[in-house]
Amino acid sequence: MMFDTLGKRCCPWRLKPSALLFLFVLCVTCVPLSVCGCGSCRLVLSNPSGTFTSPCYPNDYPNTQSCSWTLRAPAGYIIQITFNDFDIEEAPNCIYDSLSLDNGESQTKFCGATAKGLSFNSSVNEMHVSFSSDFSIQKKGFNASYIRVAVSLRNQKVILPQTLDAYQVSVAKSISIPELKAFTLCFEASKVGNEGGDWTAFSYSDESLTQLLSLEKASNGYFLSISGSRCLLNNALPVKDKEDIFTENLEQLCLVWNNSWGSIGINFKKNYETVPCDSTISAVVPGDGTLLLGSDRDEVASLRGSIYNFRLWNFTMDLKALSNLSCSVSGNVIDWHNDFWSISTQALKAEGNLSCGSYLIQLPAAELTNCSELGTLCQDGIMYRISVVIHNDFNHPEVKVQTKVAEWLNSTFQNWNYTVYVVNISFHQKVGEDRMKVKRDIMDDDKRLVLWALLVYNATNNVSLNEEKIKQKLMTNNASLEDGLRLCEVDVNQLGMCSALEDPDGFSWPATLPSVYKQPCPNKPGFFMTRACLSNGTSTFWGPVDTSNCSRQSNEVANEILNQTGDGQNLTSANINSIVEKVKRIVNKEENIDITLGSTLMNIFSNILSSSDSDLLESSTEALKTIDELAFKIDLNSTPHVNIETQNLALGVSSLIPGTNAPSNFSIGLPSNNESYFQMDFGNGQTDPLASVILPPNLLENLSPEDSVLVRRAQFTFFNKTGLFQDVGSQRKVLVSYVMACSIGNITIQNLKDPVQIKIKHTRTQEVHHPICAFWDMNKNKSFGGWNTSGCVAHSDLDAGETICLCSHFTHFGVLMDLPRSASQIDGRNTKVLTFITYIGCGISAIFSAATLLTYVAFEKLRRDYPSKILMNLSSALLFLNLIFLLDGWVTSFGVAGLCTAVAALLHFFLLATFTWMGLEAIHMYIALVKVFNTYIHRYILKFCIIGWGLPALVVSIILVSRRQNEVYGKESYGKDQDDEFCWIQDPVVFYVSCAGYFGVMFFLNVAMFIVVMVQICGRNGKRSNRTLREEVLRNLRSVVSLTFLLGMTWGFAFFAWGPLNIPFMYLFSIFNSLQGLFIFIFHCAMKENVQKQWRRHLCCGRFRLADNSDWSKTATNIIKKSSDNLGKSLSSSSIGSNSTYLTSKSKSSSTTYFKRNSHSDNFS
């Protein structure tokens, strides 16, 4: 009975209509959140952008809806909504259906179509949208899109350069930059593109536009300019030579300077290094200037990229502080905040992946560290000790209490008007009576804990902060302490400083906070004495002065450097730069260098020369200058000669007496025993030296009185390793000898009547043809140095393995050799003649290649067979090869690197295409004449085109992808004087593999095909009995000549252009190859009978015009009668298959398909 009753109640068809109506109303009123098939309309949207719509859009929205959307963005953003479509039931005051928009300040209702196409912005980082509909009249609804819009600089970066003055990015006028005796400057930057060039990242200048502080990249390195002093930063930047420090990704760079250091600290890519800059000692950066991002000068470009999170402090941070530097540490002089900057919206770009950008998830508070670990962060600020009493209601462990209090202090001071740092927090520990008092306090209430924190305030713009303000700030933020922690008491006291002090020795120590203070040693630049300001918790006092660095002698420092460069030491480019700077400092400091110190320094340079050439390149100029200065300062008071020999370097110094005719000569060779590295001789010289210098007898005559005082010595330096002499601007000449340097005192001698004679042995075992004498010019290649031949000539009387150079001045001398692909072996006159022939020939070839191509394109009957189509492709390749070659020199004159690279790559491509199509001509002849039977090839011409154009394109593409474009293609000089420039392949490996090697393969293939084809022609023509011997020879000769130009046999002259036959074969090569297009036109177009008929029919008039009824087909009917008569003719005209009747008469029927495509060509003669 019970189950029966239950069953009746559960059957819906047994319910009364009133009950059904009740259930329907209940469903509609209580479940309006989702509509069948339309999804939920109560959402929280936190994506950077997106869309949302009314329920069931674009269909009509249902009745009785109540929807809401919350759009949320991180701090520093606002929300922008745009209604793409809007159609809601319209009524006065929107009393029926409506959409409500809450932007954080006000709420607005919309209905009808009023909001369509409109955009609305929120005033905060959150916006609420609600939609409701009543029980009747449905409409289409709305479609809205939303996007975050960054308003805080934390979420935006600055794009540089900004060319218009109105868009320049500068510090706001309301911000006054104070006078700086120290600073820490950090910013993130990126660079667009790989092109080089000078740039400026930021510049700070006064009203007269005098630069006071800037970061620049120049041709010879990266510089930080401080009050007129330029400090080279290269040694501290972990980047390879010629690479930019900034890439496409933002990287943070921090610069630290104090006017008492004489150096600059650089933190970049998690690497902290210092570089010396003695000229900034005691320097001051004046205040009240203007700071710009980018360059403030027209002659220097701005960094092309972006800058982000630029912050400046008027104190220094050490490695620990920089490593722990977080986004919450605001710059006390300049911060990355809207209030500090004047930036046009055109210069800003918002991104969602910035290092200090806002996120919806709250980032953890920064970890606090001890002030002692932060170096000079605490040195220039005012320090306060904060004592807080916390009531621990829930008996949390002390570690948790300390963590929560640290987070509370950090958040309390994070966005305050004063720039302060909480750098330490700990539980209060005391001794004696104070300790007993604390203990009694805790016994009275075991939930009370006393914590001490150290607060550092760095005053900016003379804004004062006192203890009462700090205490008030903490008390008003009491509510932010959570988890059962209550603030009971706060006590703030300013920590004392060590008072200013002057020692009896005359050293002044300024008033400072507890830290280590250093100042330069007297009469010893680059070294510092130190003194610590100490604290015992209640007072501060000065510690003893540490002058150990000042007492170190140059010999001691040099020996330490020598140990750093000894055997087994792997020196990087940065290490070598640092070592050269240290040695330079020692050499500059000493007035006279004795033999002991000089030997140590020479051994340092010798060890450096054992490093790789790439690591030596950056420091080569400074190293050479330092070696020259070292040679000039070697002490000669006790001896007339000084010899210093090392493994890779030797120095000889000899005294001179002005007014005498006995200047010193010098020679250096290998020793007769193994007791030393080299053997030097001043005087008559050795019999077989590695290098020798003979000075002219009248060298010291006619010197001015001033110069006579300076000329007391002659310095000779021999370089066994030549890694310091790398000419980055020339890839054609290579150094093939040792390097010998010679100088007289400290003066410049040039334009000598009688030249100085330098004999140098070659380091290469192979014979050096046409050696070039040159000297090392340190001003070339943007101060990187390079070889210069001015004032030096090679003596005509040369022995194998050495060169005698006659020069009219003194410096570093060496012997160069031109690489085999260079044209410097050709004298200037022949170079001009060959250039003239080449350009005239290429012009003629381009004209007739175009004529050949135009003929076959214009007359459809001529291009029906395979040989004609192959000839058209070969003519196209030749035409573009000649045109690009003719335009190349003109394009080079523009000096646009990218355009030069493109032209060189195109020239390379069409050269390879020409080689390839000549090879395909040979392969086609082989197939047509030798492989006669069963040689049908599907899509024959298509496959040839894929090979003929695709293979060169593949080679050039691989080169462009696998190597940097500017390393492979670029400007090349040619001619003996290297004055003419051409866009071509720079890399010798690429040239020999992809040009010489590629051509070699094609050439030998064509030679083989040429021989096979000529054997076939001569064999078949020899069977004819109705032709005289003279006719036979002439026909075969014409076949040889026509095939020679068609298959590019004349390019083989390049293999014979060396040694004594170089000039004749260069002329043959230039004449025949530049006119290849003309010869192809003559033999394979103008002399073809079917071409002549088409010309006469369509281009001639009068008696020369061929009658229209003289049809081509009539001639074709006579082909059978001509038999092998025309074989040589058809071959010489590139119409291999035109004699198909003869060939197919002997072939199987299966070959007919192939040869019928070749049967439409006529024969010439």
Swiss-Prot record:
It comes from the Eukaryota. One of its GO terms (molecular function) is G protein-coupled receptor activity. GO terms for biological process: adenylate cyclase-activating G protein-coupled receptor signaling pathway; adenylate cyclase-inhibiting G protein-coupled receptor signaling pathway; adenylate cyclase-modulating G protein-coupled receptor signaling pathway; cartilage development; cell surface receptor signaling pathway; establishment of blood-brain barrier; heart trabecula formation; mitochondrion organization. The keyword NAD does not apply. Residues 1126-1165 are annotated as: Disordered. Forms a heterodimer of 2 chains generated by proteolytic processing that remain associated through non-covalent interactions mediated by the GAIN-B domain. In the inactivated receptor, the Stachel sequence (also named stalk) is embedded in the GAIN-B domain, where it adopts a beta-strand conformation. On activation, the Stachel moves into the 7 transmembrane region and adopts a twisted hook-shaped configuration that forms contacts within the receptor, leading to coupling of a G-alpha protein, which activates signaling. Ca(2+) binds at E89, D97, D134, S136, I137. It is a multi-pass membrane protein. Residues 854-873, 921-940, 1016-1039, 1084-1165 are cytoplasmic. CDD domains: CUB (cd00041). Residues 41-149 form the CUB domain. The chain crosses the membrane at residues 833-853, 874-894, 900-920, 941-961, 995-1015, 1040-1060, 1063-1083. It is found in: Cell membrane. Pfam families: 7tm_2, CUB, GPS, SEA_Gpr126. Disruption phenotype: Deficient mice die during organogenesis. Mutant embryos show signs of myocardial wall thinning, hypotrabeculation, defective mitochondrial and circulatory failure. Defects in myocardium are not caused by heart defects but due to placental defects. They also display severe congenital hypomyelinating peripheral neuropathy. Conditional deletion in osteochondroprogenitor cells leads to defects in cartilage and spinal column development. Conditional deletion in the endocardium does not affect heart development or function. Belongs to the G-protein coupled receptor 2 family. Adhesion G-protein coupled receptor (ADGR) subfamily. Heterodimer of 2 chains generated by proteolytic processing; the large extracellular N-terminal fragment and the membrane-bound C-terminal fragment predominantly remain associated and non-covalently linked. Interacts with Laminin-2; this interaction stabilizes the receptor in an inactive state. Laminin-2 polymerization could facilitate ADGRG6-NTF removal, thereby exposing the tethered agonist to drive myelination. Interacts with PRNP. Interacts with ITGB1. Interacts with LRP1. The Stachel sequence (also named stalk) in the C-terminal part of the extracellular domain (ECD) functions as a tethered agonist. In the inactivated receptor, the Stachel sequence (also named stalk) is embedded in the GAIN-B domain, where it adopts a beta-strand conformation. On activation, the Stachel moves into the 7 transmembrane region and adopts a twisted hook-shaped configuration that forms contacts within the receptor, leading to coupling of a G-alpha protein, which activates signaling. PANTHER family: ADHESION G-PROTEIN COUPLED RECEPTOR (PTHR12011), ADHESION G-PROTEIN COUPLED RECEPTOR G6 (PTHR12011:SF290). This is Adhesion G-protein coupled receptor G6. It comes from Mus musculus.
